[in-house]
Amino acid sequence: MGFTDKQEALVNSSWELFKQNPGYSVLFYNIILKKAPATKGMFSFLKDSAGVVDSPKLQAHAEKVFGMVHDSAVQLRVSGEVVLGDATLGAIHIQKGVVDSHFVVVKEALLETIKEASGEKWSEELSTAWEVAYEGLASAIKKAMS
């Protein structure tokens, strides 16, 4: 079964909720660093700070990550596959030392952040929609890394 219109709508509506509050970007990186403190140096906007400090670069990167997952949902519904819009993503992830376990951490942080942003609209169906979209993106990045 492919990605459905309803799943895309769920991702769209919660993506809008995420974008309304810049605090969710800080939450996202706090969750990542709590789960995998060693990843701090992988992010240029975090490596020289004492912790997660809100900044334009942090906001831009979080919006890019969540935006790419959102775009993946659209691609999955339309064509059933995710094609990276940025051909350098594989090389960047290799350069930063990203390994499979990092993709799991980011997925968990993404889902926890969307759960917080969605509030009472959170459901297993919403979680699954984001998870499938993220897995599509992660698979495309991993393919570009090989």
Curated annotation (Swiss-Prot):
One of its GO terms (cellular component) is nucleus. Root nodules. Pfam families: Globin (PF00042). The modification Nitrated tyrosine is found at residues 24, 29, 134. O2 binds at residue 61. Keywords: Cytoplasm, Heme, Iron, Metal-binding, Nitration, Nitrogen fixation, Nodulation, Nucleus, Oxygen transport, Phosphoprotein, Transport. PROSITE patterns: GLOBIN, PLANT_GLOBIN. InterPro entries: Globin, Globin-like_sf, Globin/Proto, Leghaemoglobin-like, Leghaemoglobin_Fe_BS. Residues 2-146 form the Globin domain. The keyword Ribosomal protein does not apply. The modification Phosphoserine is found at residue 44. Induction: Strongly reduced levels in boron-deficient nodules. Inhibited by abscisic acid (ABA) in parallel with lower nitrogen fixation in nodules. SUPFAM superfamilies: Globin-like (SSF46458). One of its GO terms (biological process) is response to abscisic acid. Its main location: cytoplasm. Nitrated in effective nodules and particularly in hypoxic conditions; this mechanism may play a protective role in the symbiosis by buffering toxic peroxynitrite NO(2)(-). Nitration level decrease during nodule senescence. Phosphorylation at Ser-44 disrupts the molecular environment of its porphyrin ring oxygen binding pocket, thus leading to a reduced oxygen consumption and to the delivery of oxygen O(2) to symbiosomes. It comes from the Eukaryota. It is found in: Cytoplasm, Cytosol; Nucleus. One of its GO terms (molecular function) is oxygen binding. Leghemoglobin that reversibly binds oxygen O(2) through a pentacoordinated heme iron. In root nodules, facilitates the diffusion of oxygen to the bacteroids while preventing the bacterial nitrogenase from being inactivated by buffering dioxygen, nitric oxide and carbon monoxide, and promoting the formation of reactive oxygen species (ROS, e.g. H(2)O(2)). This role is essential for symbiotic nitrogen fixation (SNF). Monomer. Belongs to the plant globin family. This is Leghemoglobin Lb120-29. It comes from Pisum sativum. The lineage of its organism: Eukaryota, Viridiplantae, Streptophyta, Embryophyta, Tracheophyta.
